[in-house]
């Protein structure tokens, strides 16, 4: 584990003991004011269907310290209720108000700017039902708006519809930009990969992307939980989404090396993706609570 001063252009090459002390000092500067641990899920608290070792105890320690845990995921293949069930199945704990997904951010965005508009949602049936329950007027033909989610039930017919609607000029919203989804053996194609496919066929880029690292999701979280940016720490394994999300919204940031990013990658990050602190895993924060 090590600490990176944001006024420096690179990661200081210091001993493990010095790095630990520097990290502890950095955390102590702001950890006491934190009210919400905003946690990425894939690669941060679990990988695939396996929780990262010690995670149940770590989450319990965070809650016992008086902080709130909020699971913040770009993965729009599941509903909030499905995430609660997944957490329970793998031995972790989560309640409905502790889950915030890019789909939820997208529903809020649609209700703010496109209320009563006809919306085509390319998503799993469960996620489409979540959009409908959120007040979105779903349609399969002639939409005003198209939403591209992480559809693990994707078919050619759905892609053809999306392409046709985009070429006709529908507003184009993507839930999030991730190219791949972490998995134990081979990463899976995610919404970013679908975006590239549709770019080739339609010539369109999303007009708006709602999930991390963008401010649509950050503003929604601040409004939902009634906190200020400096009272949130974003913890995740992806610098270009999780850490940049924190930077874009004024949150504190912790990069964990339990998922997509290894120590070598963490040493060569651009300024926009540089975290306050790097930890091997979320478990390492317990001693500072």
Description of each model-found segment:
Residues 3-6:
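Short, positively charged and aromatic/hydrophobic N-terminal segments
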Residues 15-20, 24-41, 46-65, 81-100, ...:
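Asp-based, Mg2+/Mn2+-dependent phosphohydrolase catalytic module
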Residues 75:
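Conserved phosphate/oxyanion-binding catalytic-loop motifs
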């Amino acid at each position: 584990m090590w600490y990176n001063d944001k006024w420096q252009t690179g990661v200081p090459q210091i001993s493990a003991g010095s790095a630990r002390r520097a990290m502890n000092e950095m955390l102590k500067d702001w950890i006491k004011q934190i009210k919400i641990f905003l946690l990425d899920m894939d690669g941060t608290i679990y990988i695939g269907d396996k929780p990262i070792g010690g995670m149940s105890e770590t989450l319990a320690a965070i809650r016992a310290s008086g902080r709130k845990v909020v699971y913040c995921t770009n993965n729009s293949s599941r509903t909030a209720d499905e995430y609660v069930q997944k957490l329970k199945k793998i031995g972790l704990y989560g309640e409905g108000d502790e889950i915030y997904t890019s789909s939820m951010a997208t529903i809020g965005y649609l209700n703010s700017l496109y209320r009563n508009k006809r919306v085509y949602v390319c998503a799993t049936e469960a996620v489409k039902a979540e959009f409908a329950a959120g007040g979105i007027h779903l349609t399969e033909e002639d939409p005003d708006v198209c939403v591209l989610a992480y559809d693990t039930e994707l078919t050619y017919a759905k892609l053809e519809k999306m392409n046709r609607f985009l070429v006709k000029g529908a507003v184009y919203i993507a839930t999030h930009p991730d190219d791949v989804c972490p998995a134990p053996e081979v990463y899976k194609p995610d919404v970013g990969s679908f975006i590239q496919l549709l770019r080739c066929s339609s010539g369109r880029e999303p007009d708006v992307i709602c999930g991390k690292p963008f401010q649509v999701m950050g503003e929604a979280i601040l409004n939902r939980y009634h906190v200020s940016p400096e009272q949130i720490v974003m913890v995740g394994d992806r610098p270009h989404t999780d850490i940049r999300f924190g930077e874009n919204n004024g949150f504190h940031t912790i990069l964990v090396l339990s998922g997509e990013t290894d120590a070598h990658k963490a040493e060569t990050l651009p300024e926009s993706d540089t975290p306050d602190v790097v930890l091997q895993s979320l478990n390492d924060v317990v001693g500072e609570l």
